[in-house]
């Protein structure tokens, strides 16, 4: 049976105050960045034997209650829950990434947080603020759970990373690589079926002059194709 991963893009498009300062790309909603990272994680893991769900509204129109996110996670019987966020602080020099587990979390929660924290900093090139504990309600689900903060929306240095596609890709790769390692995920096995009773041929061109046919044959062979021949039809 495949493992179950639940991803959670924090907040929603209309959540008050959850946005970047007005930087070089303007003001960007936190949820849009969180959603981008979640989608990139899903894309990275598409070839792995894992079932993935989201607890947030994937249109961003509604900020789902934390209690509802927990309920959904539990209903999915998740093995792993990861909430994706970006940080903010009144001190505009605050920088770096950090990963939270619940204050009453398990050893597995700590193991996962300690695994993701340095990887997230390494991939994004931002300061590692470490793994921490907090009483975040969304982390009270039954699954092993962490909340990731991928850089400060209120700091120019971090803003220039987290608002880019490459920065969000780095965030996603860090989390995805840790998920693969933590859950011991394997790539899906693809079984090819072969019908030995049928043979398929590819025909490339028809010509009135044999010289033109010979020229095309030579071009195909030069390109690395084998089994090329000229069939003469009367």
Residues covered by each model-derived region:
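A structural preference for short, hydrophobic beta-strand core positions in alpha/beta folds
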Residues: 54, 130-133, 229-232
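Active-site-adjacent mobile loop/cap segments within catalytic or ligand-binding domains
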Residues: 3-6, 14-17, 76, 80-90, ...
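Sec-exported extracytoplasmic/periplasmic mature domains
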Residues: 39-50, 74-78, 117-125, 176, ...
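Active-site-adjacent substrate-binding region
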Residues: 108-132
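Extracytoplasmic/secreted envelope proteins and their assembly/folding machinery
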Residues: 35-38, 42, 67-70, 97, ...
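Residues embedded in well-ordered beta-strands
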Residues: 98, 145-147, 201
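Catalytic-core regions of hydrolytic enzymes
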Residues: 1-111, 169
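Solvent-exposed beta-strand motifs enriched in subsets of small alpha/beta binding domains
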Residues: 8, 189-234
């Amino acid at each position: 049976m495949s493992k179950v991963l639940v991803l959670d893009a924090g907040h929603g498009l209309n959540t008050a105050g959850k946005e970047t300062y007005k930087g070089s790309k303007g003001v960007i909603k936190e949820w849009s960045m969180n959603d981008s990272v979640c989608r990139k994680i899903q894309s990275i893991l598409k070839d792995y034997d894992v079932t993935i769900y989201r607890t947030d509204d994937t249109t961003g129109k509604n900020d789902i209650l934390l209690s509802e996110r927990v309920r959904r996670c539990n209903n999915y019987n998740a093995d792993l829950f990861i909430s994706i966020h970006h940080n903010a602080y009144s001190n505009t020099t605050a920088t770096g990434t950090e990963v939270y587990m619940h204050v009453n979390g398990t050893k597995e929660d700590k193991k996962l947080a300690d695994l993701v924290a340095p990887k997230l900093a390494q991939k994004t090139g931002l300061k590692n603020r470490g793994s921490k504990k907090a009483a975040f309600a969304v982390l009270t689900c039954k699954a092993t759970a962490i909340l990731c903060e991928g850089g400060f929306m209120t700091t120019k240095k971090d803003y220039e990373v987290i608002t880019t596609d490459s920065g969000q890709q780095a965030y996603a790769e860090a989390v995805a690589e840790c998920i693969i390692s933590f859950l011991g995920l394997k790539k899906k096995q693809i079984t090819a079926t072969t019908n030995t009773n049928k043979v398929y041929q590819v025909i490339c061109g028809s010509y009135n002059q044999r010289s033109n046919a010979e020229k095309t044959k030579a071009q195909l062979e030069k390109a690395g194709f084998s089994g090329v021949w000229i069939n003469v039809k009367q």
